[in-house]
């Protein structure tokens, strides 16, 4: 009898220990799952950080996208110290040619891709929306134009500010070089492609801003996010160039910022995928908004 009682006691003790062990394992598993979920959510919010990721990423193209690219480059490299990102600002057309040829990973374009470019296997990845501001020197008394006035200025039909209610002063029409995405978008939106008569064609957004700001009678166009107090942004068709008006579809001159790839993003190498993961993360989206651009809808 005593032996039987001892056996029962041993079995009961073993059962209790096994139950406790299984309970402990269950608690540990739940905690691990919760931690994993929290970690995944945090990673999605902040963008993927991978200290083991190493190599290089190359971008080339639009000068209008310099402010955006530099901000993304800096924050991405902080999160991925093993990756070196290089960006060359060669113009949208050149950037698309480079990514098509495979000489860079990403081609930056401040205009939509053409059907021919897409036919070559280039994927249009829109990362932001930008407005094109029409600018004049600070001393110009004309602050509003219709889109028709703007067309006539750039096609040479109107050549003096007095014809628009301003002082007797020649209009100096400043534009970008032929390969510029800003120029391509501006001329396409105004329906004046290959019709413009420029006094000067400059090779960067900054050069246009500086030239217009220092030249009496000058008019030009630049990316909305680079506007400063050295120039006046004109009202077009009664609408100011603001983020709110662009989102509402009221402002005529807006265009996409594209980071083009040869093929779809999921076909790219791990570093390119990580770049787009970051751009599309909450942290990356905050960078886009911080530099004055609009998130694509």
Feature annotation, model-predicted:
Residues 19-24:
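C-terminal motif of bacterial Sec signal peptides marking the signal peptidase cleavage site
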